[in-house]
From Swiss-Prot:
S-adenosyl-L-methionine binds at residues 34-36, 54, 86, 101, 108. GO terms for biological process: rRNA base methylation. Disulfide bonds: none annotated. The keyword Phosphoprotein does not apply. It comes from Elusimicrobium minutum (strain Pei191). It holds the Pfam family Methyltransf_5. InterPro entries: RsmH, SAM-dep_MeTrfase_MraW_recog, SAM-dependent_MTases_sf. GO terms for cellular component: cytoplasm. Its main location: cytoplasm. This is Ribosomal RNA small subunit methyltransferase H.
Length: 293
């Protein structure tokens, strides 16, 4: 197994805002390589427990090795399974805290075989759960031009969505699009580079969201947070693009108006300059925290 690394973001802020009981039960809904979990366990007591969820089997195994702490229970499922898992583990009353870090792990981005980045020339895959049915190749080779335009516009906020979709449909007439580099080359003439940002970035984001139903998963889970948390328990959600942040902001706001939660931070929390300097991938992170009433 490769020795991948991933630097967790906003750790100090998470530690300060999520922990309400040092011997409580916490959920890391996006375990990844275990960076946030390892940091939190360093602050928690001996009786604390963290239940970590990740759809990526390799991530779960690497997290277990990286954390190496009996207080972690790592589960190879989506965080949507949290209500059932709490019940199965006979945890009464709910969790003291839930953390979601909705960013892509560095090891997933840097592993060309996963197909998340146009940099490595790997297969067009993009599945978090490699046992899942639909890949990014399935999307680009089977969706109509109208369907591609819709996901590029809605999930990637790509202003040239129609041109990008048309370029893909033209190219796949000759042969199936199979690799990330093939797709990036097809898009290059119609999606020029935006400063330091590759022109295909938003299309790749849109494909990843479509393949993994990311926005639907986030929305469904945030709505059931009151079932997962005990009174006084907190949910901390880190987002990396405006679509996710808008969903979290609006649902927290609605829950607050209905008296289910109170907002711990009324204004979004972003990384300090020093963190961004040391970890460039943290620059777009935004943290929102709510507490169950």
């Amino acid at each position: 197994m490769n020795n991948w690394t991933h630097i967790p973001v906003l750790t100090k802020e998470i530690g300060q805002m999520l922990i309400t009981d040092i011997n409580g039960v916490y959920i890391d809904g996006t375990l990844g390589l275990g960076g946030h979990t390892k940091y939190l366990l360093g602050l928690l007591g001996k009786e604390a427990k963290i239940i970590g969820f990740d759809k990526d089997y390799n991530a779960v195994k690497m997290a277990e090795a990286n954390v190496a702490d009996g207080r972690l229970t790592a589960i190879n499922l989506s965080y949507e399974a949290a209500p059932k898992v709490l019940k199965d583990l006979k945890i009464q009353g709910g969790a003291d805290g839930v953390l979601l870090d909705l960013g892509l792990s560095s090891y997933q981005l840097d592993d060309a075989s996963r197909g998340f980045s146009f940099m490595g020339g790997g297969p067009l895959d993009m599945r978090f759960d490699i046992s899942g049915q639909k890949t990014a190749a399935d999307v680009v080779n089977s969706y109509t031009a109208e369907e591609l335009e819709r996901i590029f516009a809605n999930y990637g906020e790509e202003t040239n969505a129609r041109n990008a979709a048309a370029a893909i449909v033209r190219a796949r007439v000759d042969k199936k699009i199979k690799t990330t580099s093939e797709l990036a080359n097809i898009l290059a003439p119609v999606l020029p580079r935006r400063g330091k940002t590759h022109g295909a970035t938003r299309v790749f984001q849109a494909l990843r969201i479509e393949v993994n139903d990311e926005l639907g998963t986030v929305e469904r889970f945030i709505k059931v947070l009151p079932e997962v948390l005990k009174p006084g328990g907190r949910a901390a959600v880190i987002t990396f693009h405006s679509l996710e942040d808008r969903i979290v902001k609006n649902i927290f706001k609605q829950m607050s108006a209905e008296g289910e939660v109170k907002l711990v931070n009324k204004h979004v929390i972003e990384p300090e300059w020093e963190e961004v300097k040391n970890n460039r991938r943290s620059r777009s992170a935004k943290l929102r925290v709510a507490e169950k009433i």
